[in-house]
Amino acid sequence: MATEQRPFQLVVFGASGFTGQFVTEEVAREQMASEQSSRLPWAVAGRSKEKLQQVLEKAAQKLGRATLSSEVGIIICDISNPASLDEMAKKATLVLNCVGPYRFYGEPVVKACIENGTSCIDICGEPQFLELMHVKYHEKAAEKGVYIIGSSGFDSIPADLGVLYTRNQMNGTLTAVESFLTINSGPEGLCIHDGTWKSAIYGFGDKGSLRKLRSVSNLKPVPVIGSKLKRRWPVSYCRELNSYAIPFLGSDMSVVKRTQRYLHENLEDSPVQYAAYITVGGITSVIKLMFAGLFFLFFVKFSIGRQLLVKFPWLFSFGYFSKRGPTQKQMDESSFTMTFFGQGYSHGVSAEKNKPNIRICTQVKGPEAGYVATPIAMVQAAVTFLNDASDLPKGGGVFTPGAAFSRTKLIDRLNQHGIQFSVISSSEV
C-alpha cells in the first residue's frame, strides 16, 4: 500500500529504454484492466523527463487512454548518481529495473534498493551478474527484509517456472528435465535490440569471472536423484520436435539450478536435473550457425574484437541484432514455444534401484519473447509480489523467480495473460 513516505507501489526504472518502454506500456495495460479500487500508484524513472513523458504519451495513444500521463508519476534518476537512486528507492515499494547490461548498471540499483528497504525485480539474462548479486547481497537483503528477484523476463521465467509446472503435473517424482526452445517468426524474420547483443558480448568475453565466482562459492553439490541426465552433443537431433538443437547459452541453466538448490535446501523438495537447448531447424541452419558461432567466439576474445561486435551488431549477427530493434510487425508475427521432456518415478518406485518409469511432456507458449513476453512476465511477477506477499519466502533475500514464486499464483496469472503452460502428454513406461 502506498504511503506518504513511499507514494508509489511500483516504479519502472529505465522506462525510456528500448525494453523499458514496453514494460511501461504493460504496466499501464494491467492498470487499465484492474478495477479502480485495486489500481496501484506507480511511476516511471529515468534521466530525461522529456523522454519519459514521450514514453507515457506513446503508451497513452496506443492504449487509448488520454489521461495516462497525468496518472503516472515521473522520477528523474541517473544510474551514475547514487543519491538519485536512493531518492527513487525511497519513493517505491518495488522497483522494476530495466537498465542493462546489468553487469555494468545493475549493482548500484540493487545496492540502493537494499539500503532503502525497497524490493527490486529485474529482467537480467546474465548469469555472472545474477550469481554475483546472490553472493554479495543475499544476507544484506534478508536483514532488511527486502526481495531482489532476478531474471524475471523471458530469461528465465518460462524455463524456471516451466520446470516447476512440469514437476507439479507429474504423478510421481520428477528427477530430470530437458527443455527445447523454439523461436517462431513471420515473413519479415527476427530482430533483437542490440542491448541483448551487448550483454552476450561482455558475458562471453568475461567467462573467467563466472568460473572464478563459482569456484570460490563452496556450495555443496545438489544430490542427483535417479538416473543421471546425460548431456547431449553440441549439435544433436531431437526426434520429437523434428529439429536439430544446440545448448541454450542464456541464463536458464544457471537460474533453474539455483532454484532447485534453494527448493531442496530450504523446502526439502526433491531436486530436478536440468539441461536447456534451442532448436535450430535443419542441417543447413546448423552449418550457418556453426560459422556464425566460431566467428563470434573468435572476436569476443579480444578487446578490439568486442568493440567491433558492439559497433556493428547487424553485420556480425547476420542481421539478427540491430540498434533499432524489431519492427512492430516483426513482433506481432513472432512467438516462442518451450517444450519440456521430463522423466521420473511413480510413487512407491525406488529411484536408487530402478530406471525412470514416467515420462511427461509439457509446453510453455507465448508471444514474441523479448519485448512482448518479457514485459508480461515482469509485470505479472510484480503483481504477484505485491498481491501474494504471504506466499513469498519468509524474510527476504536475493532469489530466482522459481525460488520466489514457487508457491504463488504467478503461473495462473501468466496463463491469463498469454503465456500458456500446458501438459502435452504423460505416461508410465
UniProtKB/Swiss-Prot annotation:
UniProt-recorded Gene Ontology molecular function terms: oxidoreductase activity
UniProt keyword Acetylation, yes or no: yes
Originating gene: Sccpdh
GO biological process: glycolipid biosynthetic process
Database matches in PANTHER family: SACCHAROPINE DEHYDROGENASE-LIKE OXIDOREDUCTASE
One term under GO cellular component: lipid droplet
Modified residues (Phosphoserine): S209, S215, S217
Keyword Phosphoprotein (UniProt): yes
Domain of life (superkingdom): Eukaryota
EC number: 1.-.-.-
Protein name: Saccharopine dehydrogenase-like oxidoreductase
InterPro entries: NAD(P)-bd_dom_sf, Saccharopine_DH-like_oxidrdct, Sacchrp_dh_NADP-bd
Family: Belongs to the saccharopine dehydrogenase family.
A Pfam family annotated for this UniProt entry: Sacchrp_dh_NADP
Entry-annotated residues carrying N-acetylalanine: A2
Keyword list, A-Z: Acetylation, Oxidoreductase, Phosphoprotein
